[in-house]
Swiss-Prot record:
One of its GO terms (molecular function) is ATP binding. The gene is alaS. The keyword DNA damage does not apply. Gene3D superfamilies: 2.40.30.130, 3.10.310.40, 3.30.54.20, 6.10.250.550, Bira Bifunctional Protein, Domain 2, Threonyl-trna Synthetase, Chain A, domain 2. PANTHER family: ALANINE--TRNA LIGASE, CYTOPLASMIC, ALANYL-TRNA SYNTHETASE. Its main location: cytoplasm. Pfam families: DHHA1, tRNA-synt_2c, tRNA_SAD. The keyword Transmembrane does not apply. This is Alanine--tRNA ligase. Belongs to the class-II aminoacyl-tRNA synthetase family. It is found in: Cytoplasm.
Length: 879
């Protein structure tokens, strides 16, 4: 056995299966496509599900891949052990109804023993206990020693997930110190002790499990294999853990260099070093695939990983931002197989640095709050932190709840998860509502995805808006039908169509389908998971049946407006790169007949001057009346010509390139004008942030742009009429009015202060004494926070000894302040505790120091009730 680098193992594997007539596919994105059962791709076969289920036709019946994967199910163990990690690569070879056991078992043995040259006396094989066929092949088609083959039960060697495709599997294992194993029992024991490790799983998908629990044979069985690249590298490099594998150790060494820590010298530091080493790999690949930090979904997973790694950097004594610098090491070791990493290097680093800086802004304050919570819990001999406090750390300071749990665990404290989940309910409901019912293989369980794969629709809509065709499929009420009549709504599929199906941010076409006997309104047009074009229709007249000859006609005016907006989006993209910077990348878009929306990577608001310049450039390109050309070419040729590709798309070998003069060139399957002059005019309506590092521009074109300008002009005219001036005088008039209002506001505030001073005497006259402590409390009207604090200071100073609690209803908001002299604090008074109890009654919350605290409330009607509780609260605190 010769030592092999991780990258070398990957290449040897893929080359081997290419030699067996497999198509090598690049790794799919970590973001699942058309699979709502997964947040992130977590297995080699996950992106290939549509091929296994028959929903899509594979590009080849034999495929081999090395798939990047992220799993965070056992993230709490990452770092604590040297085995766990969130990022890994899974090598696999797959057969979609082509070869089966008789081919894959000898191939697996050939690769293992002849390419990797693993010693045969170090290898073991397991099979499903009833799989005599697999045993026969291992014994008679390879030179594997039969004594080293063990039959195991369903739990170990049968792959199934609920109902549907399933089957037995055979695994190849490597002896890492077990010595000679003679029985299944000895084998299982050695595996549990990690003395024998599994490195390749061959799954034979040959059954379909039905609802009665029967295993029915599949007509076309499949092969699905998986070999963990990192685990294989530990074997080939004779190291104990993934953190000692060449490419991963390079990252670990950089972490040690940045922190000044030495690996394997301090158990606690080793945990932090491993966490950072693992997490930066996941972080780099996730951002490369277009995922951005957020508080929901996969963006939350990324934020959690990033902030967990940043926090462990601080544990190692790294007090500045550092994670973005580790990205270079990850990319240097991976870019040959993942060229997108190099292409997006600067973008990835900017996103990481931005998130690090945001976390840095809050972590110190958040840690101080958390430390206070820990002290409070311990002082009260509690073992649980309340859910509302954990939620405050999450909501205000950006602490993922898992990070809070991890820190608390070190102190022997847990979180009230029920209380936290209650606080999180709104966010969780939003996330849950976005999910639709799916089956276990990830496809939406709908009749629309069960259309015969042999039925194809040719799209002719680039050049035509009206075509003749035949009806291939009719769907109504979630069933395939032979006909559909007036008043019904459903789906029609034809053999060819001019209707553009919603895709790439462009909305689907509308129009009509008709013949002499019927007429249907097309209200939408989409694609199903296998790419079939679906016309969503309402039958207006007559009846339509399968194989009827029909005419399909697109709403021309609507399509033309969509074209204008789509081409304008391309010009906008190019203008943004020119004005804002070449880091700009599209992260989403939406184009319909009324407006366009463009999301792009940028790290701050686009300035007014920049927006004006962008708008000017776009209109300049429109006025040039540039020809808009489309050309189908090889993907590599398109890239060489500088065509912009979408951030997270995987493209076929041949792509459609849309060019607007020599100003813009993008890969695009949408519909466009033939000349930029047809757009007419372009106006930006808004610019805003939608996520960390992502901005959004909304704009209108043509007549909608004219309507927008007219609307703005009408507002100016109405404003001038209200101020009784002409439009030229409007700005001067407004400035004068604003200055006048500010003077009036100053006068009003001065009057309020006078009133507050008058209230001071009344409050002092009504002081109560509770257990030897003077208490002044009152609700005052229309005083802002500053004035309320000033009033509190005066009353406390006048009292010389005591506590004062004031509340105010200011512009519909409730404000509270509490102050106490030092001697009353010594007697047990704690303003933070008082203010928390009082503010809760008015629907608010807050806290602070023993001698001073402030809070807010939501219900002005409860202000008086809240103030009435002050004396009771003080009484409960005074010793």
């Amino acid at each position: 056995m010769e030592r092999m680098g991780l990258n070398e193992i990957r290449e040897e594997y893929l080359k081997f299966f290419e030699s067996k007539a497999h198509l090598r596919l690049p790794s799919f994105s970590l973001v699942p496509k058309n699979d709502k059962s997964l947040l992130l791709i977590n297995a080699g076969m996950a992106p290939l599900k549509p091929y296994f289920t028959g929903l899509q036709v594979p590009p080849n019946k034999r495929v081999t891949t090395c798939q990047k994967c992220v799993r965070t199910g056992d993230i709490e163990n990452v770092g604590k052990t040297s085995r766990h990690g969130t990022f890994f690569e899974m090598m696999g070879n797959f057969s979609f109804g082509d070869y089966f056991k008789e081919e894959v078992i000898p191939w697996a043995w050939e690769f293992t023993t002849e390419v990797l040259k693993l010693p045969k006396n170090k290898l073991y094989v397991t099979i499903y206990e009833d799989d005599d066929e697999a045993l026969d092949i291992w014994v008679n088609k390879t030179d594997m020693d039969p004594k080293r083959i063990f039959r195991l039960g369903k739990e170990d060697n049968f792959w199934e997930h609920g109902l549907g495709p399933c089957g037995p599997c055979s695994e190849i294992h490597f002896d890492r110190g077990a010595g000679e194993v003679k029985t299944s029992e000895e084998f299982v024991k050695a595996s549990d002790e990690d003395k024998i490790v599994e490195f390749w799983n061959l799954v034979f998908t040959q059954f379909d499990k039905d609802e009665e629990g029967n295993y029915n044979k599949l007509a076309n069985p499949n092969i699905d294999t998986g070999m963990g690249l990192e685990r294989m590298a530990t074997i080939m490099q004779n190291v104990d853990t993934i953190f000692e594998v060449d490419t991963i150790k390079a990252v670990l060494d950089k972490v040690c260099k940045l922190s000044g820590a030495n690996y394997k010298e301090d158990r606690v530091k080793d945990i932090s070093i491993r966490i950072i080493t693992d997490h930066i790999r996941s972080i780099t690949f996730m951002i490369s695939d277009g995922i951005l930090p957020s508080n929901e979904g996969r963006g939350y997973v990324l934020r959690r990983l990033l902030r967990r790694a940043a926090r462990h950097g601080k544990t190692l004594g790294i007090n500045n931002t550092f994670l973005h610098n580790l990205t270079d090491i990850v990319i240097e070791n991976c870019y040959k197989n993942y060229p997108e990493l190099e292409e997006k290097r600067e973008y990835i680093k900017k996103i990481i640095k931005l998130e690090e800086e945001r976390f840095d802004e809050t972590i110190d304050a958040g840690m101080q709050i958390l430390n206070d919570y820990i002290k409070e819990v311990k002082n009260n001999n509690y073992k649980i932190l309340s859910g509302d406090k954990a939620f405050k750390l999450y909501d205000t300071y950006g602490f993922p709840v898992e990070l809070t749990e991890e820190i608390l665990e070190e102190e022997g404290i847990s979180i009230d998860k029920e209380g936290f989940n209650k606080e999180m309910k709104e966010q969780r409901e939003r996330a849950r509502s976005a999910r639709e019912e799916t089956n276990y293989m990830g496809a939406e369980d709908t009749i629309l995805n069960k259309i015969d794969l042999n039925i194809n629709t040719d799209f002719e809509g680039y050049d035509k808006l009206e075509v003749k065709s035949k009806v291939a499929v009719i769907i109504k009420d979630e069933e395939f039908k032979n006909e559909m009549e007036k008043g019904n709504e459903g789906v029609i599929v034809t053999y060819n169509t001019p209707f553009y199906a919603e895709m790439g941010g462009q909305i689907g076409d509308t129009g009509i389908i008709y013949n002499d006997n019927f007429k249907a309104e097309v209200i939408d047009c989409k694609k199903n998971i296998s790419g079939k074009i679906l016309h969503f229709v309402k039958i207006l007249d007559g009846k339509v049946a399968l194989e009827d000859q029909v005419i399909l006609k697109v709403n021309e005016e609507r399509r033309n407006n969509i074209r204008k907006n789509h081409t304008a989006t391309h010009i906008l993209h190019a203008a943004l790169i020119k004005v804002v910077g070449d880091h700009v990348q599209q992260s989403g878009s939406y184009v319909d007949d009324e407006r366009l929306r463009f999301d792009f990577s940028h790290f701050e608001a686009v300035s007014e001057d920049e927006l004006k310049e962008v708008e000017k450039i776009v209109n300049k390109e429109i006025m040039k009346a540039n020809a808009v050309n489309t050309k189908v070419m090889n993907i590599e040729e398109a890239k060489q010509q500088g065509a912009i590709a979408l951030f997270d798309n995987k493209y076929k070998d041949d792509v459609r390139v849309v060019s607007v003069g020599d100003f813009s060139k993008e890969l695009c399957g949408g519909t466009h004008v033939s000349n930029s002059g047809q757009i007419g005019i372009f106006k930006i309506v808004s610019e805003a942030g939608v996520a960390a590092g992502i901005r959004r521009i909304e704009a209108v074109t043509a007549f909608k742009a004219m309507e927008y300008v007219d609307h703005k002009n009408n507002i100016l005219k109405e404003a001038a009429q209200i101020l009784k001036c002409n439009e030229k005088e409007l700005l001067n008039k407004l400035n004068h009015q604003v200055l006048e209002m500010k003077e009036k506001e100053k006068e009003i505030e001065a009057l309020k202060l006078k009133l507050a001073s008058g209230a001071e005497d009344e409050i002092l006259d009504n002081i109560k004494e509770i257990k030897g402590v003077k208490v002044a409390s009152a609700a005052v009207k229309d005083i802002d926070g500053n004035a309320l604090r000033d009033l509190g200071d005066k009353i406390r100073d006048n009292m010389q000894s005591g506590v004062v609690v004031l509340g105010s209803n200011y512009k519909g908001k409730v404000l509270f302040v509490a102050m106490a002299t030092k001697d009353t604090v010594a007697k047990g008074v704690h303003c933070g505790k008082i203010i928390k109890e009082v503010a809760t009654i008015a629907g608010g919350g807050g806290g602070g120091r023993p001698d001073m605290a402030q809070a807010g409330g939501k219900d002005p009607n409860k202000l008086e009730d809240a103030i009435k509780t002050v004396e009771t609260v003080v009484e409960s605190l005074v010793k």
